[in-house]
Regions:
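Active-site rim helix/loop that mediates acceptor-substrate recognition in acyltransferases
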Residues: 4-32, 39-50, 54-60
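C-terminal "cap" of GNAT-fold acetyltransferases
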Residues: 102, 109-110, 125-147
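Conserved acetyl-CoA-binding loop of GNAT-fold acetyltransferases
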Residues: 117-127
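Conserved acetyl-CoA-binding loop-helix of GNAT-fold acetyltransferases
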Residues: 75, 81-94
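Short acidic/polar active-site loop segments enriched in Thr and Asp
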Residues: 24, 102, 122
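Conserved acyl-donor/pantetheine-binding loop and adjacent beta-alpha core of acyl/acetyltransferases
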Residues: 35-74, 80, 130-135
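Conserved GNAT acetyl-CoA-binding A-motif
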Residues: 89, 95-109
Length: 147
């Protein structure tokens, strides 16, 4: 629903992520309807540079890793433009700060760069990622700067 087919991970990969790193999922639920409004997920690693293999291999998760590779921030269309994405990122960063993580690292398309900059991320330029045949920016957020 939130990602076009060329950018979406397979159902199998998502199930593997849930099995291997359930603690790295954060889900927003509409209190009135009980409907899932959005989610954020990632894998922990000591690596500093995003690579496409993180999308495909949940076994790359290192529960002691100092960084989190964000693999998906998804907000259903009817919940967008209400600050939910910002709040999910903030809550996720605060949670991972307590786990002694250092950075959230992600890739995003050009159109999303301003949003992530507004959230406090730094744009490191074009990523080596070729996921979905797209051109991606690599961005990071120093978790210790989040309050």
């Amino acid at each position: 629903v939130c990602f076009p087919p060329n950018e979406a991970c397979s159902e199998k990969n998502m199930i593997e992520r849930i099995k291997n790193a359930p603690e790295l999922f954060l889900v927003a639920v509409d209190k009135e309807t009980g409907k899932i409004a959005g989610s954020l997920n990632g894998l922990a690693t000591d690596e500093e540079v995003f690579r496409d293999e993180f999308f495909k291999d949940a076994y790359l998760n290192n529960s002691e890793g100092k960084n989190i590779m964000i693999l998906g921030l998804s907000i259903l269309p009817e919940y967008r433009r209400q600050g939910l994405a910002r709040e999910l990122v903030r809550q996720y960063a605060l949670k991972e700060k307590k786990n002694n993580r250092e950075k959230l690292i992600l890739t995003c398309l050009d159109a999303k760069v301003p949003m992530y900059l507004d959230f406090g991320f730094t744009d490191h330029g074009i990523s080596d990622s070729v996921w979905g045949g797209e051109v991606w920016h690599e961005m990071s957020l120093d978790i210790h700067k989040v309050c």
